[in-house]
Amino acid sequence: MTRALPSWPQFNPKTIGRVAAVLKSGKVNYWTGPEGARFEAAFAKWVGVKNAVSVSNGSAALHLALEALGIGRGDEVVCTPYSFRASATCVNNAGAKPVFADVGTDHMLNAASIAKAITKRTKAVIVVHLYGQVADMGPILALAKRRGLKVVEDCAQCLGGEYRGRKVGTLGDVGCFSFCQSKHITTGGEGGMVVSRDRKVTDAVRSLRDHGWIVGSSPKAFDRIGYNSRLTEIQSIIGLGELERFDSWNLPRRRNFAEYLLRSLGGHPLVKYAPVDTKVRKASFWLVPFVLDAKKLKCSVARFIEAVQKDGVGVYKIMWPLMAKKPVAAGLIGNTIGFWVHPTYAKDDIAAAVKAFRKVADAMMK
């Protein structure tokens, strides 16, 4: 018998009422109302920087961040082959060339793999904090400093993750966030944010997202080719509502569910690698990934995951194709099962997923 899982996202009545108020006001464009600026200020304060710029989606955040850093034609950027494609195609969008490095068993780039991919044309590295895990940023930042590289943090799946007590997105030169439908929070289906300690970077993003506007000019003047990548007032008011309840409801539930999964399955004989969650690298768990030991199964990992899914539980097979052939990444992407930990779930939903995993493992392990 399959279960009916709670949907995600779900918006509370307070946020829905605020959306209605914005609609009634008729001030729905970023430049006609106050909510866009309010959302940016609230997010900047929450993440721990002074500068934040909202954009239309996470892909735009990455693209505009690279252009704001001066990355362009003739440059190379080190990327992971193991992420949603926007984590690398943003480099092409900026006119530069992505160069792929392999990942570690934690699913993410590390300093050693990045070092092997650096050439005389390398100008930056994009570090993806995958699945809500936090990359080992200390050695990466040290390498970048030695080699004169910019560090872009792709935090699309890691809102609220921390490295040595600092939120992801504030460690490198620029941090990029996504508020797409399935993410930790959404601004009504799409949305993104760019943050930086460097006001010049965020001013450049602010200009690029608005057709090349010279920030602060009135009447508007333009000095570069830009784009239309602004959030609407409706999206911003949704973002404010989701941010307000993130630390009190959303993130604690994700972490509690993840801790239960780690206790229950971290030592299971079928699990080869469990997710990284330490005091130094504090995960925020978009999902909880376990890498399975395929040699211990009588079937493929894909077939195993399909069997677990038949119990109606929230597990996920990684669907992204690799963007380059790298051995560690290839071994991970086909053998990883992800457990959703949406805050709308109940403890019983997570317990049912554990039960289904164990049942199928008992039947399908050699």
Predicted feature residues:
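N-terminal "arm"/small-domain region of PLP-dependent enzymes with the aminotransferase-like
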Residues: 1-28, 339-340
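Phosphate-binding glycine-rich loop
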Residues: 29-76, 90-101, 166
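PLP-dependent aminotransferase class I/II
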Residues: 37-41, 50-52, 124-128, 138-139, ...
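Structural detector of well-ordered beta-strand residues that form the stable sheet scaffold
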Residues: 53, 78-79, 99, 151-152, ...
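PLP-dependent aminotransferase-like
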Residues: 67-155, 162
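Hydrophobic/aromatic ligand-binding patch that stacks against planar heteroaromatic rings
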Residues: 89-91, 143, 167, 184, ...
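Conserved active-site segment immediately N-terminal to the catalytic lysine
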Residues: 153-188, 217-223
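Active-site PLP attachment segment
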Residues: 170-209, 213, 233
